[in-house]
Design a protein with these regions (language model features):
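Extended alpha-helical scaffold segments
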Residues: 1-12, 24-27, 31-49, 54-67, ...
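Terminal, low-structured helical/coil segments at or just beyond the last alpha-helical repeat
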Residues: 197-236
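Amphipathic alpha-helical repeat scaffolds of TPR domains
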Residues: 29-46, 58, 87-109, 123, ...
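Flexible helix-coil transition and linker loops at the boundaries of alpha-helical arrays
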Residues: 22-28, 64-93, 107-112, 124-137, ...
Length: 236
């Protein structure tokens, strides 16, 4: 079974809506249209028909972006939380945007022509919703790195991962992803492994005082057991 890294699922953010900030809710008709498109995409998504789900959901993402722009929303919660709820559907936006990220990555693994879309989505999310939950932002930064790696910009991918641990030094997932980049285990990254570099990164994460050290300790234990069959090491 593949150990390919999947983003940790996060709850919603706690964006603060200042006094006097009132956001107009969507009309029942608009709300229904967005919810209907979201549910339509879950049909292929649940059958692992990733590209088909993305074809339905990417236009929906653009529609949500218009709502986000027009109402000055800065974090995921701004759509669904508080007295002035903007959107309400069968599936929470907070869950759906993570499912779209998952669908895009899986579509790109199967068909690399999707990687530019993955890159666009991950960057757009962080630009438009910078006050979201920290784990959401870490996940999107890692997704951006995955996309850069997927289109052959490996050096930029690592720079993105390194910036992420600087910005989120206590995030075990930020450190884990950077170490995974070099581990050679089946986490979906390209390039030859440098297991000593991976080990050093995991250990730096532990020294930084990450919130859940077990994530990194498990990876260090895996490295200690030796490379997986077929792992290509970087020549010394």
């Amino acid at each position: 079974m593949s150990k390919r890294y999947r983003r940790a699922v996060a709850g919603c953010s706690n964006e603060r809506i200042g006094p006097g900030r009132v956001r107009e809710p969507l009309s029942p008709r608009e709300n229904h249209a967005l919810d209907h498109a979201m549910q339509n995409g879950y049909v292929p998504y649940q059958d692992d028909r990733w590209a088909e789900a993305c074809e339905i959901w990417l236009p929906l993402w653009e529609r949500f972006l218009e709502v986000i722009r027009s109402r000055g929303i800065r974090g995921v919660d701004g759509l669904e939380v508080g007295p002035d709820t903007v959107y309400s559907g069968l599936q929470a936006f907070c869950n759906w945007f993570q499912d779209l990220a998952d669908a895009l990555e899986n579509a790109a693994v199967k068909d690399p022509s999707w990687w530019p879309k993955v890159l666009e989505y991950s960057k757009e999310f962080r630009e438009r919703l910078p006050e979201s939950n920290g784990l959401h932002l870490v996940n999107m930064a890692v997704l951006e790195a995955r996309a850069l790696d997927g289109i052959g910009r490996r050096a930029e991918a690592e720079m993105t991962l390194e910036r992420t641990v600087v910005e989120y030094p206590t995030s075990e997932w930020a450190w884990a992803s950077w170490g995974d980049f070099w581990s050679g285990d089946d986490f979906g990254w390209s390039g030859a492994a440098d297991r000593e570099k991976a080990r050093a990164i995991y250990q730096r994460g532990l020294s930084a005082g990450v919130e859940d050290p077990d994530i990194l300790l498990e990876r260090l234990q895996s490295l200690a057991q030796g490379p997986e069959p077929g792992t290509q090491e970087t020549p010394e």
